[in-house]
Structure formats: C-alpha cells, structure tokens
Amino acid sequence: MARDLAIDLGTANTLVYAKGQGIVLNEPSVIALNQQTGDVLAMGQEAWQMIGRTPGYIVAVRPLRQGAITDFDVTQRMIRLLLQRAGVSKFNRPRVVICVPSAITEVERRAVTEAARRAGAADAQLIEEPMAAAIGAGMAIHEPVANMVIDVGGGTSETALIS
C-alpha cells in the first residue's frame, strides 16, 4: 500500500507508479458504464474488451481528450478505481503526482487536482508531462545543459527544451 503515487493520466492509457514498487498499473483510459443506473461496470483492459460486445445501454467512456478532462465525474471515478487497484483505502490516502500536458488551462489543471482529491488522494500535485519524462529518463534537469524531450502520447505530443 503505497503512500506516494504518480499517475500518468493519458488520453489512451493510464499508468500508476508506486514509490518503491515501480509501475503497478498500465491500463487503457476507458470505463464501461451502465447508462440506465450510472454504475461503473469495468475499467481499463476489462472495459476495453467489452466494447461492441454489450447491450446498447452499456457504453465505453474515455473521460479525457487531448490530455484534458472531458467528463469530470467519470475521471474522478476512474481515479478512484486506479487508487483502489493500487492498494489505497479510505484509511491509507496517498499523496499523488499527476502528469498533465503543458498546454492545459488553469481551469483544466484545477479539475485534475480536484478529481484526484475527491477520488481519495490526500494531496494532489501536477507535473507537466515533458518534465516528468525528463525525470523518468534520468536527465540531469538541474544541470546547466539543455535537454530536448519529445513526449508522444495517445492524445497529445509535446516537445520541450529543459535546462
């Protein structure tokens, strides 16, 4: 049960990293919802496999588009399920860092942190995706040298010069 988690909340896939454990989840960013009841039936790979194989009232929802939240409620529910799968409980609320595209607005940034807090995070901080990629690649981000980062994702692609 990790107290520190990092989430790459991607348009196509979502990864969860737990401090000391590495990547503990790598799932498609999709949820299967029962439109009649509002219940979440599945998330990730399980929801992906349901596409086209369920009655019409069960829909697959991708709550992010181009790295920004398009459905706040579904995003919150997806983050809650991700936290549960990572071993988080009501009594074990983690600190969370979430990767976001550099170009999202301040309102979109607040939506991400609020969704994470409502989903069960004790604290939620954001890091821009190119910076997270540079840190993850072991680049010396505090050194007086320039590093170019190209982050290609399912919904956004970014290029950054980090020095």
Language-model features: locations:
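Nucleotide/phosphate-binding catalytic cleft detector across ATP-hydrolyzing
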Residues: 1-154, 160-163
